[in-house]
Amino acid sequence: MAINKENKVIVTRGRSFGESSKEVIKYSSIFVEELKKQHVISVLKHFPGHGSSLADSHLGFVDISKTWSEKELEPYRHFIKNNKVDMIMSAHVFNDKLDKEYPATLSHNVNTNLLRYKLGFDGVLVSDDLQMYAISKHYNLKETLTLAINSGVNMLLFANQLAKPITLDEIVDTVYKQILSEQISLETIINANKRIDSLLQKL
């Protein structure tokens, strides 16, 4: 939602369908439906809301604790309730109302307790680019992967644009070692794969 008109990463770039949940729901519903007709999977973003922020998470830490409100959840709630969303992307924003320690992408409270349990989302949760500075300047690769996966993220995004390129082998090896050391549950990985496989069957 385009809440903060001075927001330079979402609002001034025209990356939102409107200022109100009514506008966002109306126009994004049309967009999602047309994509579906073309067998294209749509992704709602950036959960739990980025339109009220004052900073850009590509560049560093973004705190929305004083600007965010629950009305930013309304479009997500609508799409989930009406079973019209296959994927949601997390935001790298920090909100102490939702988690006192971690930004949303790395937060179990946001991605599992709020999104899964409270709102009832059962689709695929994908991270935003994990090399954006809001994450990569504060967490190393092992910490990022462990926290993101354990928070409930099913699909990890590395764009290799903002930081030193990371290979798939590095990611897989790191996750594998964390499973062996019982820092990540194998069941969590299996469940994530099941969600992704289920999504791909819809194409």
Where are the regions that the model predicts?
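Short, charged, amphipathic alpha-helical segments
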Residues: 190-193
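A substrate-binding/cap region within the structured catalytic cores of diverse enzymes
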Residues: 1-32, 36
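Active-site microenvironment of metallo-dependent hydrolases
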Residues: 203
